[in-house]
Each structure stands twice: as C-alpha cells, then as structure tokens.
Amino acid sequence: MNASLVGLAVSCCAVGMIASQAFAAEPGPLDRAILPLQEPARPLSKVLDARNATVPPRFEVKAPDGAPNVVIVLIDDMGFGVPTAFGGPVSMPTLDALAQQGLRYNNFHTTALCSPTRAALKSGRNHQTVNMGFITELATGLPGSTGQIPNATAPLAETLRLNGYATAAFGKWHETAAWEASVAGPFDRWPTRQGFDKF
C-alpha cells in the first residue's frame, strides 16, 4: 500500500514538472487565422512569495512586423475615370502619390449609392448579402434591404483592429439606419462598433 502511494506521488511530481516545463516554454508566433487572437498560456510561477515574483509582460496584440499601412479612399459622386491616377483629366496630386506607392483596385461593383457601396467595400461582400440594398433611409425590411448590416459580418476594419492595427474612419458614414441613430443606441452598427477606434 505504501509503495503504491509513493509511486503515485512520484508520478504526480513527474507530471507536474513536465507540465510546468511545458508552460514555461517561450510562446511561438501568434496564430492569426482565427480572430480574436488568443492570449498564449502564461508560465506558472514557481515562487511562493508574491513579493518575490516577476510579473510576466502584459499580452498585447500588435500588427505583424513589416505590416503595411492600409488606406482606403472612397469618394462619392465621382466617376472611376475622373482622377489622373486612373487616366482621367482631373489632377489630384495627393491621390496620385498614394496610388503610385500602393495598390489600385479597378474591378469593384458599385451601386451608385453611398450606403451599399460602403457596405460592400467594408465587408468584401455583395451589398445585398449585408442587407444594404439601398441607402439606409430607403430600407424596405425585406431580405437584402433591411439597412442593418448583420452582426455576423466581419468588417475589414474589425479584422485589422483584431490584428493589432490602429483604425480610423473620416467623413460620412451613412450605414446606420435612421431608427438606430439616437443617443440611446443601439450602437452596434456605429463606426466605433464596426472596427474603427476613432471616427
């Protein structure tokens, strides 16, 4: 009986030592495939007196090393071929400079309405898939045109924010239904709940 208790105690100690070594291992790179990023397991403290313990660094999500800046420019009521950046006659030096250093996307469906275009650009989905068939004031309540972007939609800004980017939106929003735009909320379709730190 005593021999089996000693054997059990030795086994438990060995398992405990192996587990503590596993927890003490340096965390590897973060897996960014699933958001939000999960905090790596913290090492167990081996110090009994909290006054002598070393506090591990706080977990913070940061953008990956060398991550590019992401700037999206959406201008209402301007044709695709108007700016010189896309071969048009209107000189826009700042836009030209941004286009020279970045990527130009020229295959994007627009509805010629601001709310659906913004919703499609932000989500990467067809505007009706995210319930923005018209501008929010003309929402019908029918599928694809409720004027309420589903909470299950992952906006680009939220994806970037969860990967450690600082995000901001400037200018017109026009994606919150009129009946949700009050000081009482709901706020889940406001810019700061769609992934933007600042608006």
Where are these regions (language model features)?
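Formylglycine-dependent sulfatase
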Residues: 17-199
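N-terminal secretory signal peptides that target proteins for export/translocation
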Residues: 1-5
